[in-house]
């Protein structure tokens, strides 16, 4: 019997949804196959904003997850639908998920250059600054809000107290804002030159860092988790209304 997972949102959201499906497949033996329903993306274009919504596409092809598993669920099928943004949703298959989320992407020379720079540092720290659609999309802004300079200042101060000579790698689509607001020695700002296929360059590079200052974004959550982050700092207020903070692991620091 097939178990269907309804995919929605961007890459980080799809990763949570897929993980919940893998977990359910293990938990309920009556299901033998996991299928991905990507009908949410029909007629959408990547990064096109229309009527207050950001267009999305099926993104799990950046890993070794076959597109052959994408199939619209027939009427009457068992369907998992939700966001599942909590480690408890797939803790029973976490090792399997780490293996399945192996990148199947040919990264650019620029991305490989930054990767080499990360490996050359004793204490490479990833900082993710999510602005973009959180600013220009009214729905995203009212739902997520935007992390301001104060959050990053406090987080950097904490990292500096924990590590000797950390080197910060800032990943963002808003390079100008980062240049004006992220002030610390030993800083490399990584912008669109390392986006690569479906923006995976930033996620891949974040997984190579030792510790992480994440945004209120599932994208950077995965950067920290897949990177086995030594020290992760995240926002106490994940969504603008104050909900959603249970996405943070118990061992992560909230600011």
Question: PLM features: residue spans?
Answer:
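N-terminal pre-catalytic "stem/leader" segment of glycosyltransferase-like enzymes
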Residues: 1-39
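Short, solvent-exposed loop/turn segments at secondary-structure junctions
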Residues: 10-12, 39-44, 84-88, 130-135, ...
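Conserved aromatic-histidine-acidic binding/catalytic patches
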Residues: 5-13, 140-144, 197, 211
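Gly/Pro- and small hydrophobic-enriched strand-loop and loop-to-helix capping segments
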Residues: 26-37, 226-255
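Structural motif
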Residues: 2, 124-125, 167, 211
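Donor-binding and catalytic core of enzymes assembling or modifying cell-surface/extracellular glycoconjugates
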Residues: 11, 158-233, 240-242, 247
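Short beta-strand segments
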Residues: 35-40, 128, 167-172
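Secretory-pathway luminal glycosyltransferase catalytic domains
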Residues: 43-163
